[in-house]
């Protein structure tokens, strides 16, 4: 999945969990669970286009979190956000820095994901984002 759904999930976990161990564990777990949902993901590459895409994605996720946490942005929320994107950042670093001894992680991370076309893959991610936004306003 893109960064935005992961960032929102991590922020939501940071809002409701008090213990930092649980925040990290649940954020990582939800990252992997979200990756099981069929989605669109650009492939890791050292290119201007990928950097721009990822930067805009991070910015959108950050801005959505700022909007959703209005005044209750805490270190726990930040920790949840960082932990939730760690698997993707780690995979990107392994691929781009050619850290071949860590390729098993990248293989595992790719294996659990089902890539769909940009249209359907983005539609699924928009639904995930909307569910988290609705949860924020209806439940928490």
Residue positions per predicted region:
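N-terminal membrane-targeting hydrophobic helices
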Residues: 1-140
């Amino acid at each position: 999945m893109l960064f935005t759904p992961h960032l929102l999930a991590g922020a939501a976990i940071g809002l409701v969990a008090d213990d930092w161990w649980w925040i990290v564990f649940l954020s990582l777990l939800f990252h992997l669970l979200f990756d099981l949902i069929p989605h669109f993901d650009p492939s890791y590459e050292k290119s201007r286009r990928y950097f721009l895409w990822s930067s805009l994605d991070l910015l959108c996720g950050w801005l959505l979190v700022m909007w959703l946490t209005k005044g209750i942005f805490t270190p726990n929320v930040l920790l949840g956000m960082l932990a939730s994107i760690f698997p993707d950042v780690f995979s990107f670093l392994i691929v781009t820095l050619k850290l071949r001894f860590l390729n098993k992680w990248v293989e595992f991370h790719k294996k659990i994901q089902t890539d769909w076309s940009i249209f359907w893959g983005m539609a699924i991610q928009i639904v995930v984002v909307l569910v988290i936004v609705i949860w924020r306003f209806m439940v928490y």
